[in-house]
Regions:
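N-terminal soluble segments of membrane proteins
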Residues: 1-93, 107-133, 148-157
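Hydrophobic transmembrane alpha-helical segments of multi-pass transport and channel proteins
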Residues: 134, 138, 142, 146-147
Length: 157
């Protein structure tokens, strides 16, 4: 139980760190510099701060935190001795996968609707999209059947 608590705190701190990186680091000049000359430090900053990749991190971390919250609630409801660790671990990993699936469906929709949805990005755009992605990623991890219902309402799924 203690290790799951520490893992949950680590996931929440990583989500907060990823959100702050996406919110406070402007990736547009970094991407321009990277296009001229490659260096690993700039590359890693672009990977962590550019909206599409940052949203992937946020979505996966939100899915994991949703699954971890569900796991904590489940252990309170049925008792910790009734929970099988292997099955619980796969549910938590499934939460991260559900967050990733939502992110992939969002990206597919963004590129279907616009030619270059992330060519130039703004902080306002980031705050709007990051909030929605994180919230639905959390719900997808907390209640995986919810993701299925959301995707069923989208044409083509």
């Amino acid at each position: 139980m203690l290790s799951k608590s520490l893992f949950t705190i680590a996931i929440l701190l990583l989500w907060l760190l990823a959100f702050c990186v996406g919110a406070f680091i402007d990736s547009n000049p970094l991407r321009a510099r990277l296009a001229q000359e490659f260096d690993i430090e700039t590359f890693l900053l672009v990977i962590s701060a550019w909206i599409p990749t940052n949203l992937a991190f946020l979505s996966i971390l939100a899915g994991l935190s949703g699954a971890l919250c569900r796991s904590f609630l489940r252990s309170v409801e049925v008792g910790i001795e009734q929970i099988r660790p292997g099955k619980e671990r796969s549910r938590i990993i499934g939460g991260g996968v559900a967050g990733l699936l939502f992110y992939l469906s969002l990206m597919a929709g963004a590129f279907l609707l616009m030619n270059e949805p992330f060519e130039t990005t703004t902080k306002q755009q980031y705050f709007r999209v990051a909030g929605v992605v994180s919230f639905i990623g959390f719900l997808a991890g907390f209640r995986p059947d919810l993701l299925r219902r959301i995707l069923n309402n989208l044409p083509g799924f």
